[in-house]
């Protein structure tokens, strides 16, 4: 008599009252009955940063069928430098020390070969590195 639950009150449905699915299982099966035995939890978080992939062109199609293509450098580029292995000091308040954003001035259909040979963002990383070095000294 003790193995079965008591009957429900008058007027209640009996469809949800049943014996638990964990009855008769081993103690190790009570903790993870739905997971396969080959499943291993990762003990630590990943230590390498995730880098977003940037496409070299942006293609948009309007409802009437017109195709617009914006090539490099006519769209905004965001990039991050690799973080240091050990941080000596935290960044300044309200300053993100590793993220830079370069926004173009206009749309250029042709890509100049001199643009690809030069660093298009010369002051971005050196500015943040000078801030960090001046604070850590």
Swiss-Prot record:
The alphabetical list of record keywords is:
Chloroplast, Plastid
Q: Mainly localized where?
A: plastid
User: Where found, per UniProt?
Assistant: Plastid, Chloroplast
> Is Chloroplast a UniProt keyword of this protein?
yes
Has UniProt tagged this entry with the keyword Chloroplast? yes
The Gene Ontology CC terms held by the record are: chloroplast; plastid
Similarity comment: Belongs to the ycf72 family.
Q: What is this protein called?
A: Uncharacterized protein ycf72
Organism field: Oryza sativa subsp. indica (Rice)
């Amino acid at each position: 008599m003790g193995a079965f639950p008591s009957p429900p009150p008058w007027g209640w449905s009996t469809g949800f009252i049943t014996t638990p699915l964990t009855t008769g299982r081993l103690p190790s099966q009570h903790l993870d009955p739905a997971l396969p035995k080959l499943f291993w939890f990762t003990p630590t978080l990943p230590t390498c940063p995730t880098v977003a992939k940037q496409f070299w062109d942006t293609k948009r199609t309007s409802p009437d069928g017109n195709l617009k293509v914006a090539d490099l450098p006519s769209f905004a580029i965001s990039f991050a430098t690799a973080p240091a292995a050990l941080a000596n000091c935290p960044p300044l308040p309200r300053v993100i020390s590793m993220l830079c954003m370069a926004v173009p001035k206009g749309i250029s259909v042709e890509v100049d070969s001199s643009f690809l040979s030069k660093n298009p963002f010369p002051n971005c990383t050196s500015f943040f590195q000078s801030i960090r070095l001046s604070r850590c000294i």
